[in-house]
Curated annotation (Swiss-Prot):
InterPro entries, per database record: Amidohydro-rel (IPR006680), Deaminase_MtaD/DadD (IPR023512), Metal-dep_hydrolase_composite (IPR011059), Metal_Hydrolase (IPR032466), MTA/SAH_deaminase (IPR050287)
Record protein name field: 5-methylthioadenosine/S-adenosylhomocysteine deaminase
Species this chain originates from: Clostridium tetani (strain Massachusetts / E88)
GO molecular function: 5'-methylthioadenosine deaminase activity; metal ion binding; S-adenosylhomocysteine deaminase activity
Cofactor(s) required, per the database record: Zn(2+)
Residues the entry annotates as binding Zn(2+): H65, H67, H209, D297
């Protein structure tokens, strides 16, 4: 399909064009072919035309760290710090999950993400073959990561490699994968060494939690006399490209390790606040030119998958933490939620900008809303004024997924019904 979005404000996230006050975007198949100021003067025959008047186009948002299947546990285990929350609530009930549960939960997550402009998500969970199915059925870009933890790590690593082989054969263009060891405190040294070697051998990126809480840092320090970053460096995890979630408790040397290895940091401000884990020193990492992107974490610790909320929280929290209103601008937050996320997760595809030859993942926001007027600074409006309900068009991989707030190929009512029935099965048994 070829799509023309005309009469639209365009936030390109590209330094050369930045914001186009009124222009057009031409999409052919899965790529952006033209982005220009003014009117499209070419032949409009056979084009699917979207009138963008009163709307703003942004690159599709990239949720760089989540656990989509955990929508089941939204609001479950409230009011506990991370370690108690995991040990007393989450891990025991997760043992009851089956593949079909994760599929239905991920369907709900996909709806929630698409509705608020997220077109790509980086997942770490169980039964990831079900997540593959959902990504393809719902036409959302998915980075698939089998969660590797505990004594079953060898089986889980094999599962990750097997899924990666299938993804490489997939023709949808929507899928990639990462090797996803859960964390340094849920895996042995031997396991992490083996995972590091396998990731390097397979040329796969790694997705891992690092230094989320002070408890984690203390556990690793007591066991290995190293910080989590120092320990992971010693076992070879950083020999591959790494996307590190949280990174709340880092020493100066830890930040140097991340910088030297080209590691991307995934900032999860709402989850870190809700679990009282702490505040990551994001502004300092940005000053060091560490690539910082943004994630929601799972709904059980957030409790939503709204990247627009995450941008606002993320920037306000840094301003407050440093007591400096100049820290982490709205434009930088949007970059973290788009291009920086794509840069962290995807190696050989152009994603995260509205620019010629980039993948056509685009969201349109309706600016004709009380909370979106006036438009003195469009980046500020998107980050501080929007709440996600303004998203009324979503395009993923060159296909229109949502039009005027309605899903084109997804039976939303069926998804909601199936999810509610599945929750009865989980919580009543």
């Amino acid at each position: 399909m070829s799509i023309l979005i005309e009469n639209v404000m365009i936030v390109t996230m590209d330094e050369e064009q930045d914001v186009i006050k009124e222009g057009y975007i031409l999409i052919k198949e899965d790529k952006i072919k033209e982005v220009n100021l003014g009117a499209y003067l070419g032949n409009k025959e056979n084009l699917y035309i979207i009138n963008g008047e009163g709307r703003c186009a942004i690159p599709g948002l990239v949720n760089a760290h989540t656990h989509a299947g955990m929508t089941i546990f939204r609001g479950y285990g409230e009011g506990l710090p991370l370690m108690r929350w995991l040990n007393e609530k989450i891990w025991p009930i997760e043992s009851k999950l089956k593949g079909e549960h994760v599929k239905i939960a991920t369907e709900l997550a996909a709806l929630e993400m698409l509705r608020s402009g997220t077109t790509c998500f980086n997942d770490m969970y169980f039964y990831e073959e079900q997540v593959v199915k959902v990504a393809k059925e719902f036409n959302i870009r998915g980075i698939i990561g089998v969660s590797i933890m505990g004594d079953s790590w060898e089986h889980q690593l094999k599962e990750a490699i097997d899924i990666d082989k299938k993804i490489k054969e997939d023709k949808s263009g929507l899928l990639d994968s990462m090797i996803a060891p859960h964390s340094p405190y849920t895996l042995s040294k031997e396991a992490l060494e083996s995972i590091g070697k396998e990731a390097k051998l397979q040329n796969k990126n790694i997705h891992i939690h690092i230094s989320e809480t002070q408890d984690e840092v203390n556990i690793i320090k007591e066991k290995y006399n190293k910080t989590p970053c120092e320990f992971l460096q010693s076992v070879g995890i950083f020999n591959s490209k790494v996307a590190a979630a949280h990174c709340v408790y880092l020493t100066d040397e830890d930040m140097n390790i991340l910088k030297q290895n080209g590691t991307s940091v995934i900032y999860n401000p709402q989850s870190n606040m809700k679990l009282a884990s702490g505040i990551a020193k994001i502004a300092e990492m940005i000053d060091m030119d560490i690539n910082v992107c943004l994630g929601t974490d799972g709904t059980s610790s957030n409790n939503n998958l709204n990247m627009i909320e995450e941008m606002e929280t993320g920037t306000i929290l840094q301003k407050l933490y440093y007591k400096d209103a100049t820290k982490l601008s709205a434009k930088k937050a949007l970059e973290m939620a788009t291009y920086n996320g794509a840069k962290a997760l995807i190696n050989n595809k152009k994603l995260g900008k509205i620019k010629k030859d980039y993948l056509a993942d685009i969201a349109l926001l309706d600016l004709n809303k009380p909370n979106m007027l006036p438009v003195n600074d469009i980046h500020s409006n998107i980050v501080f004024s929007a709440n996600g309900s303004e998203i009324d068009y979503v395009i993923v991989n060159g296909s229109v997924v949502m039009e005027k707030g309605e899903f084109k190929h997804i039976d939303e009512e069926k998804v909601l019904y199936n999810f509610k029935e599945m929750c009865k099965d989980i919580f009543n048994n």
